[in-house]
Amino acid sequence: MSSGFGQRAVRSLKRRLGLTDRERIKKLLADPPAVEEDRIVFTSSEDYSGNPKALYLYMKEEGLLEKYRVTWLFERRENCFDFPEENVESLCMFNEEGKRSWKAQQAVMRARFVFYSHNVNWVKNFRKEQTFVDLWHGCGYKGALKSDATRVFYDYLMVTGERYIDIFRDVMDDPDGNILDLGYPRNDMFRTRRSDAAAYLASLKERTGAEKALLWMPTFRQSTVKRLDTDIALSSSGIPLLYGEEQLRQLNDCCRAKGVLLIVKKHHLQVTYDLPGEGIDHVLFLDGNDLRKGNADLYELLAQTDGMITDYSSAAIDYMLLDKPLGYTLDDFDQYEDARGWSFDNVKDYMPGHHMYTMEDLLAFVGDVAEGRDPYAADRARILPQMHTYTDGFSRRIAEYFGL
């Protein structure tokens, strides 16, 4: 029996035994379940990460979850795990056939509060008795794709600072929207030790003999999601300034000589990097799965580093809170401007750090960090209050605002 026939037989059997997920969802939309005051849902794009995870952990530690029945929604079945708390359940958003799960649909439709990092437009039924809070996934430099952003539903959306309120109202085509500059819960993780991030980084440094560590977080150029693809390809590797093996080995030699471990964290939307690995010992390439296996939260890991390299990512805005050196790769600035645009004018004026257009610029930044030089500290102090209304207590502030 062919696999195609077998799948059809399974679907046919399911239909005879009961309603399919699609049919159940239609019934839920036609006859919505009652909203229950003690139900709360969390979900994030990379599964148990980012702002929803940080807010959840804060509420758990403060005993604020005890009065709720909590559901965590996961996009990928392989990331789904059971929580030890009796009042916390985990559900996959999709069934075995890759279709939307009716149980996930029901969980959201019954929840009093829904906290998420991107969007939950698939719910299709939003009622006034519910509160949908988009904690969002970053206030950065790059312009948003309006065609995509205007599909995002929320009752409230979080930003880091007052400057971003009007920016997001414009992007979301929501001039009177509830955009709140309460900050991001994930930035609380700079001060916590909930994961094994410190030990994880220490082991990597010990393995290489490095004394200092840099984290490089390039934003995506070639995306796994085609509607988000900027199609910028100055570098065959997919990473700015690393145009090929020669540049990678040059960077690795510099890091080895300076006693620096450089960790390149791949953006979850970036297609796989195309780089050699043989003989590369001081430049390490990691992704979200690597951090998950090491029980290392990304933002707790960032707090342990000595500096950061990025470009147009919101992570640079967050990293300013740590008051550590920043380096910006800008070799594709003009191409990115044409492809995506910027959140505000004169964007380079709000990048308080090394502006790196060449490999020599990048090597100079590595050298400065290795030798403890920080020439842009005053610039960071000047820019920080323009990007962040608050510098701590982000989860607490959100919990208090919504009376959780």
Please report, for each region that a protein language model flagged, where it lies by residue.
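Active-site and donor-binding regions of nucleotide-sugar-utilizing enzymes
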Residues: 39-194
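Catalytic binding pocket for nucleotide-activated donors in carbohydrate/polymer assembly enzymes
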Residues: 151, 277-281, 312-387
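A nucleotide-sugar donor-handling region in carbohydrate enzymes
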Residues: 10-25, 141-145, 152-234, 238-239, ...
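Membrane-proximal basic amphipathic "stem/tether" segments
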Residues: 1-37
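Catalytic donor nucleotide-activated moiety binding site of glycosyltransferases and closely related
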Residues: 71-86, 216-217, 221, 247-291
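A donor-sugar binding/catalytic signature common to diverse glycosyltransferases
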Residues: 114-139, 293-340
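C-terminal alpha-helical cap of glycosyltransferases
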Residues: 391-404
